[in-house]
Amino acid sequence: MGEDSTGAGANGVDDGSRDAVRVRIAVRADVPAMVRLLADDALGAAREQLDGAIVAEYRDAFDAVDRQPGNELLVAELGGVVVGCLQLTVIAGLSRRGVTRALVEGVRVAAQLRGRGIGATMMRVAMERARAHGATVMQLTSDASRIDARRFYERL
């Protein structure tokens, strides 16, 4: 925990305040911001909730992910504010002579900040972390109805 990567220079993000996006391992205190990001479109709003007792369910889920080896929740910060998140899971496999895979899901960037390189920086960091864990294949899940997200992934 506590490791981070900064996307500066060509891969960084300039929001006018000279703050670069910083990608780091999520902590429990990030859960409300992450859920808000997950609910930041019509599909997510139908799936996610952030009120009262439900927050405890998300914190329990965070704890379960955090305890499971090979699972990482990453957040992107800009100016100290969480503006993106994703989940990276490293999976041992039998196929391809036992190749280790990485699965990326739950990728979100705040709607008002899309198109500024934050998602690309998050994916670059996820790929670096996956390689560091021995993964040689990376898979990504995305809902077919998220057309803009699919276009983004196709450009990577």
Where are these predicted regions, by residue range?
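Residues forming the Rossmann-fold NAD(P)(H) cofactor-binding site
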Residues: 116, 120, 124
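Conserved GNAT acetyl-CoA-binding A-motif
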Residues: 123, 130-142
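Conserved active-site tyrosine of GNAT-family acetyltransferases
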Residues: 153
